[in-house]
Amino acid sequence: MARADKATAVANIAEQFKAATAALITEYRGLTVANLAELRRSLTGSASYAVAKNTLIKRAASEVGIEGLDELFAGPTAIAFVTGEPVDAAKAIKTFAKEHKALVIKGGYMDGHPMTVAEVERIADLESREVLLAKLAGAMKGTFAKAIGLFNAPTSQMARLTAALQEKKAFEPASAE
C-alpha cells in the first residue's frame, strides 16, 4: 500500500471514528466473504463494518484522541462503527457471533471510554431504546394514575360522607321540640 493510500485510509478511518457513537471491535479470522456480507446486512442502518490493517486503525484512533484500545488491535481486526443505537449494533454482532464461532468480539469504545467484551455483551443484552421508553411511559402512566387517585380521594370521600349524612337524616324521624 502506497504512503498516499495509507494516509487516505487513516483519514477515512479517523472520520468514521469521529462520526460514530460507538465502535465495536471484532476479530473475523475464519469468516468467509459471504459471512462478512451477511454481518454487514444485519448491521444495516445502525452501523458500518470495516476491515482494516491494525497499524492504520491505531494511527486513526490516536489522531482522534482515542486511547486504550491498542491491545485490541492484534490479528485480523474489523470494526463496527455505530452511527445509530449502540444496543442494536451490539445485539446484531452478538447474535452473529453466536451463530458463527469464528467471529470474536474483542471490545469496543463508547462515550470516550474503552469497553471490555463483557461490557459490549451487557449492552447487547439491553432492550432497545424504544422498548425502554415504552416501559418508562407505562410506569409513569401508572404513577400518574395513582397520584390522581390520591388527589381525588379527599374530594370523593367528602362527597360520599355528605351523601351518607343526607340519607341518614332522611330516614331519621324529625325531632319534636
Swiss-Prot record:
Alphabetical list of Pfam families matching this protein: Ribosomal_L10
Keywords annotated in UniProt: Ribonucleoprotein, Ribosomal protein, RNA-binding, rRNA-binding
Coiled coil feature spans: none
Presence of keyword Membrane: no
GO molecular function annotations of the record: large ribosomal subunit rRNA binding; structural constituent of ribosome
Gene Ontology, cellular component aspect: large ribosomal subunit
Domain of life the protein comes from: Bacteria
InterPro entries: Ribosomal_uL10, Ribosomal_uL10-like_sf, Ribosomal_uL10_bac, Ribosomal_uL10_bac_type, Ribosomal_uL10_CS_bac
GO biological process: translation
Cited function: Forms part of the ribosomal stalk, playing a central role in the interaction of the ribosome with GTP-bound translation factors.
Binding partners and assembly: Part of the ribosomal stalk of the 50S ribosomal subunit. The N-terminus interacts with L11 and the large rRNA to form the base of the stalk. The C-terminus forms an elongated spine to which L12 dimers bind in a sequential fashion forming a multimeric L10(L12)X complex.
HAMAP family the record matches: Ribosomal_uL10
Similarity field: Belongs to the universal ribosomal protein uL10 family.
Protein name in the entry: Large ribosomal subunit protein uL10
